Amino acid sequence: MITEVAYARTMADDTRARGGAGGPAHAVHLVEQSLKSAALDSGLEWESPEPGSFVVTLPGTRKLSTTCSLRVGRHSLSVNAFVVRHPDENEGAVHRWLLERNLKLYGVAYAVDRLGDVYLSGKLPLSAVGEDELDRLLGTVLEEADGSFNTLLELGFASAIRKEYAWRVSRGESTRNLDAFTHLTRPAENPGPA
């Protein structure tokens, strides 16, 4: 004889297998509806290159934009967003900063790929996928990718910033987009005779 609990589990498994509530098809629908709503509310740009896969462009202020990939799997929604390429220098300091930031993040964590490029990556169980949770997750990605961008550039690319600044000045080109790094580009002050 089948118990009520066993019957409920069987029905839930059957519903998921058919793509019902809590399954991948339902999650795809929820993600798509959430992105459509965000596009209407705030002009968020997104596309779905294939079923269950979404690419969202998050606008930034420090970093022009962050491309975020959302992929619905059998059991979870994964999120990945490129933040910055492999640092040119101070790799240990960059990695330490990333690990310390991970302690404060919601739903995602900084990760490094085999080339050393920095990403934000996370997974969410399909049962937790909904408009509010997706908004919270994308908000975290945007806040971190954009908010940490200048810090990561300072830590991992200070020499490149100085070279770029000097090159632009020597050619009379604008240095406006390097204004956030003036503390790195201004000449060292001479203390003068003692």
What are these model-predicted stretches?
Residues S69-R74, E133-L142:
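Extended Gly/Ser/Thr-rich low-complexity repeat segments
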Residues M1-S65, D113:
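Charge-rich, low-complexity N-terminal segments
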Residues L115-G139, G147-F157:
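Well-ordered alpha/beta subsegment
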Residues L153-A194:
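Short, highly charged C-terminal tails/helix-capping segments
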Residues N80-S121:
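Short, internal acidic amphipathic alpha-helical interface segments
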Residues E50-D88:
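Hydrophobic-cavity lipid-handling domains and compact docking modules
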Residues S34, A38, W97, R101-L105, ...:
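Conserved short hydrophobic interaction patches
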